[in-house]
């Protein structure tokens, strides 16, 4: 099964908590703090794997969560960092942020790696909080939470040459005759339901990658059939080989088909429409009258194309000429990165980690309630039964401006302040 788009949720690892510990050793009655730091959480890393050609793995696994860092230990032992989670993706995968649909990264190079989200920093142990005036801190810092993100993976095949044309014109036959690719071939429409890639390696020419794009039909640019899905795979190709069934045995008019396909390209992307094309009149062995080819060639040249190649993929007649022309043109067409404007790029906000603080007055009980993620983090860092730890606790409240805000709200001496399950009386 060929899967070229997937949505997944990712989350980096949480940092380990710093330890609260004191040196306990015989003959050392006043051993100081020796709590170690927590380890950093694991990162989420994307890596290109050329052995993968589809996003099928993401059809069954939708969540990727990196390992948390270990908590710090006694004797200044640092917690082990969480293992990074490496997610392998096919070359040509574009990563978008789901909500905005903006591009985070274009993974288009062999073995390319990209750190998608960093793990949370490990918290400091109480050894780091010791000062000449605070020699035995009974508090430590909890680890920072990991980052999370919902992303869309979109695969756009990387090929030098794209085979373009209506269904059943001979694209798969040409690919199978010139590469080791084995696309399904049969004499009916939509035999090919997924793109196929093959490497053209012929003596005397530089090898190149060719893609058989499933047959595009009229209205593809508006999403008729699987048009949009197929058209996007052509975007990365440098050269198009536009194949037309010149025999007309299926009741189609070759020139009309040629024009319609180009109209679909233009509707989808002007840049794609403007891409160099080699025009190929296939199934020439079934042609009953050479005038049909000559008329087609004349009309195509009137549109500005220099030449039409007469070919029969089934008998290999004219195939070598088309392949050599493709190789020649590729030498003159520079390799370009996928163009992504600033407006299309997802730029994450710089995270100076801040925690929400909410202060409300409970009129019924005349209590000031402080809540939010800041409270959760602060309470997890202190020992409320230790006087030194409580002094640190009140210092943080002052430094964060919470005490000033309480005074502005009209708090009075003896009023109760509650943080989760912890309460204290406010004293002027």
Curated annotation (Swiss-Prot):
Cofactor or coenzyme needed: Mg(2+)
A cellular component annotation (GO) from this entry: cytoplasm
Enzyme class: hydrolase
Compartments where located: Cytoplasm
GO biological process: ribosome biogenesis
InterPro entries to which the protein is assigned, alphabetical: G_OBG, GTP-bd, GTP-bd_Obg/CgtA, GTP-bd_prot_GTP1/OBG_C_sf, GTP1-OBG_CS, GTP1_OBG_dom, GTP1_OBG_dom_sf, OBG_GTPase
GO terms of molecular function: GTP binding; GTPase activity; magnesium ion binding
UniProt-listed SUPFAM superfamilies: Obg GTP-binding protein C-terminal domain (SSF102741), Obg GTP-binding protein N-terminal domain (SSF82051), P-loop containing nucleoside triphosphate hydrolases (SSF52540)
Pfam family, one: DUF1967
UniProt keyword annotations, A-Z: Cytoplasm, GTP-binding, Hydrolase, Magnesium, Metal-binding, Nucleotide-binding
Residues of the Obg domain: 1-158
Record has Lipoprotein as a keyword: no
Residue span(s) of domain OBG-type G: 159-331
The keyword Transmembrane helix appears for this protein: no
EC number: 3.6.5.-
Subunit structure: Monomer.
Family indicated by similarity: Belongs to the TRAFAC class OBG-HflX-like GTPase superfamily. OBG GTPase family.
Function summary: An essential GTPase which binds GTP, GDP and possibly (p)ppGpp with moderate affinity, with high nucleotide exchange rates and a fairly low GTP hydrolysis rate. Plays a role in control of the cell cycle, stress response, ribosome biogenesis and in those bacteria that undergo differentiation, in morphogenesis control.
Name assigned to this protein: GTPase Obg
Organism the protein comes from: Clostridium botulinum (strain Alaska E43 / Type E3)
Gene behind the chain: obg
């Amino acid at each position: 099964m060929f899967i070229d788009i997937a949505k997944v949720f990712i989350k980096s690892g949480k940092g380990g908590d710093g330890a609260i510990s004191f040196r306990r050793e015989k003959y050392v009655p006043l051993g100081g703090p020796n709590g170690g730091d927590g380890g950093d959480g694991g990162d989420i890393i994307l890596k290109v794997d050329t052995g993968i050609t589809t996003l099928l793995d993401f059809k069954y696994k939708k969540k990727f969560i990196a390992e948390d860092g270990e908590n710090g230990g006694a004797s200044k032992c640092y917690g082990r960092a969480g293992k990074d989670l490496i997610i392998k993706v096919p070359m040509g995968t574009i990563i978008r942020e789901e909500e905005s649909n903006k591009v985070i990264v274009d993974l288009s190079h062999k073995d390319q790696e990209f750190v998608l989200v960093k793990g949370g920093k490990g918290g400091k142990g109480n050894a780091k909080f010791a000062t000449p005036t605070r020699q035995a801190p009974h508090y430590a810092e909890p680890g920072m939470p990991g980052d999370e993100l919902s992303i869309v993976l979109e695969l756009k095949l990387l090929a030098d040459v794209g085979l373009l044309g209506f269904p059943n014109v001979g694209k798969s036959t040409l690919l199978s005759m010139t590469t080791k690719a084995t696309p399904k071939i049969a004499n009916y429409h939509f035999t090919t339901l997924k793109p196929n890639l093959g490497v053209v390696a012929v003596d005397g020419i530089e090898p190149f990658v060719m893609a058989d794009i499933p047959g595009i039909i009229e209205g593809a640019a508006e999403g008729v059939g699987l048009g949009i899905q197929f058209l996007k795979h052509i975007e990365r190709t440098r050269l198009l080989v536009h194949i037309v069934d010149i025999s007309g045995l299926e009741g189609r008019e070759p020139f009309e088909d040629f024009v319609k396909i180009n109209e679909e390209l233009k509707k989808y992307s002007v840049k794609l429409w403007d891409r160099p094309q080699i025009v190929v009149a296939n199934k020439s062995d079934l042609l009953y009258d050479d005038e049909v080819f000559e008329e087609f060639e004349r009309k195509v040249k009137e549109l500005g194309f220099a030449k039409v190649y007469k070919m029969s993929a089934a008998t290999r007649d004219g195939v070598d000429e088309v392949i050599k022309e493709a190789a020649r043109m590729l030498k003159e067409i520079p390799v370009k990165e996928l163009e992504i404007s600033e407006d299309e790029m997802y730029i994450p906000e710089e995270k100076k980690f801040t925690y929400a603080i909410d202060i409300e007055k409970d009129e019924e009980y005349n209590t000031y309630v402080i809540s939010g993620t800041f409270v959760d983090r602060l309470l997890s860092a202190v020992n409320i039964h230790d006087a030194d730890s409580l002094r640190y606790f009140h210092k943080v409240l002052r430094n964060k401006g919470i005490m000033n805000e309480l005074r502005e709200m009209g708090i009075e001496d003896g009023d109760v302040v509650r943080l989760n399950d912890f309460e204290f009386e406010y004293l002027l």
